[in-house]
């Protein structure tokens, strides 16, 4: 949301009114979710009104999930961990931190975030459930099972 330039997109910070956000940027997401029911959406690198989109719980949970009825999984843009805080992103509702990692880049901070209460275990479970639901949906579709 609010990332409409390629140059310096990891440093872009959009400041805009609620009206502009909803009428210009969010309207296309609302239509896409209503018409196409996407399996996933991706947060951008940029910040919007002071919050990195990957960390924006109000945007992910309040607008996309509650208002627009989005039921798929949310993923970060590629290598967003150098922009957004992993713990805040998971708590906001990011289900998949792309591209993933074979080291401790994600795992240790997430475990510690659960232990110290910065990540609600219910939210983490919900994030995993969103991914598994789409995996199951795709497998069933591939097998021709309803």
Residue ranges with predicted function:
Residues 1-146:
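Glycoside hydrolase catalytic-domain context in secreted enzymes
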């Amino acid at each position: 949301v609010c990332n409409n330039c390629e140059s310096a997109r990891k440093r872009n910070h959009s400041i805009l009114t609620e009206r502009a956000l909803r009428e210009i940027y969010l309207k296309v997401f609302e239509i896409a979710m209503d018409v196409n029911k996407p399996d996933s959406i991706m947060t951008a690198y940029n910040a919007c009104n002071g919050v990195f989109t990957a960390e924006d719980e109000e945007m992910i949970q309040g607008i996309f999930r509650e208002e627009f009825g989005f039921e798929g999984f949310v993923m970060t843009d590629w290598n967003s961990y150098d922009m957004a805080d992993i713990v805040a992103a998971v708590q906001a509702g990011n289900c998949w931190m792309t591209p993933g990692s074979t080291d401790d880049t994600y795992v240790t901070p997430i475990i510690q975030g659960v232990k110290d209460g910065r990540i609600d275990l219910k939210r983490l479970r919900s994030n995993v459930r969103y991914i598994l639901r789409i995996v199951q949906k795709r497998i069933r579709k591939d097998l021709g099972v309803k």
